[in-house]
Amino acid sequence: VDGGRYAILGPSGCGKSTMLNIMSGIVKPSEGRLLFDGVDVTEETTSDRNIAQVFQFPVIYGTMTVYDNLAFPLVCRGYDKAFIQSKVNEVAEALSLEGLLSQSARKLTADQKQLISLGRGLVRDNVAAILMDEPLTVIDPDLKFRLRRKLKEINQKYQSTLIYVTHDQNEAMTFAENIIVMDEGEIVQVGSPAELFDRPKTTFVGYFIGAPAMNLFECNVVDAHTIKFGSAKISTETDLKSVKDGNLKLGIRSEYVQLTK
């Protein structure tokens, strides 16, 4: 855990949520091992992993106040009242919930309820990472950008590792420092938003990242740094010595096309 912001991105049904649930311990992998900082935690219980999880739909205690919701993890661990009050007030201020602490949690808006779910992870000093499974699904579109910005502010303030699952490339590209792209249960590429956009390693990533998608064309290798596309020859910095002719495609982003007279 390094305090970074990560996104797991892919189409519906590709295994994103399953991977997240394996990380948290809700699901046990059928094979393989799970390592955190090189330590095998495959057999560790959910509570022993020191992971907080924010689900697609807000999980709150509707009969409690906002304050009691945020305090609940600390109360369960036996912290004294003075520490709990200090920590809850600190987190509530960071999440802009300080004016709502005495209100019933069930009366809040969907975005406020989701912030409570996030806050319950932040009040704990021992949380190694906060896992978020499509946390903005129930949030109005005009609030999504504001909440993503709030999440980035929280990451910078607390240096908490945030892992964000989404099928929305815009959410992933504007939130994460590094993105794990999945397709059909496999990780197909890991990289920064710029790396995924400019240098996709598979046709799937080329099509999936970007709006519009990358234009892909069949091409042939001429030599180590030249390809042939139709009647044109194009030089590239990429070393093509190990590339087989039949596996090569030329990718062009429309954003980089310039027309000259």
Describe the role of every protein-language-model region.
Residues 32-40:
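Conserved ABC transporter NBD signature motif
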Residues 17-20, 116-118:
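ABC ATPase nucleotide-binding domain helices that frame the ATP-binding cleft
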Residues 226, 230-261:
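Glycine/charge-rich catalytic "coupling/switch" loops of P-loop NTPases
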Residues 9-11:
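The feature captures the beta-strand-to-loop junction immediately N-terminal to the Walker
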Residues 24:
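Helix-to-loop junction immediately C-terminal to a conserved catalytic motif
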Residues 27-28, 35, 75, 156:
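A position-specific signal in ABC ATPase nucleotide-binding domains
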Residues 6-7, 53:
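Short beta-strand immediately N-terminal to the Walker A/P-loop
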Residues 50, 60, 64-202:
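ABC ATPase nucleotide-binding domains
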